[in-house]
Amino acid sequence: MIFEFCYHITLIYNEYSNNIAERIGHYTQLPNGWEVVPMQMLCSLTDGEKLDGKEMPNLDVKYLRGERDLKTLTYGRYVAANSLLILVDGENSGEVFRTPIEGYQGSTFKQLHIAENIHTDYLLHVINLHRKSLRENKIGSAIPHLNKKQFKAIEVPVPPYNEQVKIVAAINSAQDRLDTIMENL
């Protein structure tokens, strides 16, 4: 979609399993003012501060997806309203949620903190672009976990902030048009 100008997709033969793997690579010639940096330079994954004795909502994945009513806990790791949580355990590792209210972070999450010089929605689009790869490369056998090493190593093309704003606007516009098309099918 909008990332076509800075990404190209190639198929590579996986010599070990005879499968074709999708690889997203960067063009070597980026526009002036752009740079490619690892994800770990743009954001961090943390746990909230431990609190005990205060009744607050449990912000677990089922609640955040609207699949379950609100439950409360009297202890946990604090998350402010409008924080970003990234799913690090389970089938959908790499999925990001914005908390509608303050509460305790679910046990399958880490808080996602994005650097101030990065447009939040720009980085969320980049993370979403890599969700398939993150899901397919989980670690752990009983409960699959987000491969944090892979996540931190994702190479992100970073344009100047005003370009990030334009890219986000273009992506949102394209998604709105696609939604309109889907509604009219």
Which residues does each predicted region cover?
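Short amphipathic alpha-helical signal-transduction/dimerization elements
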Residues: 127-135, 175
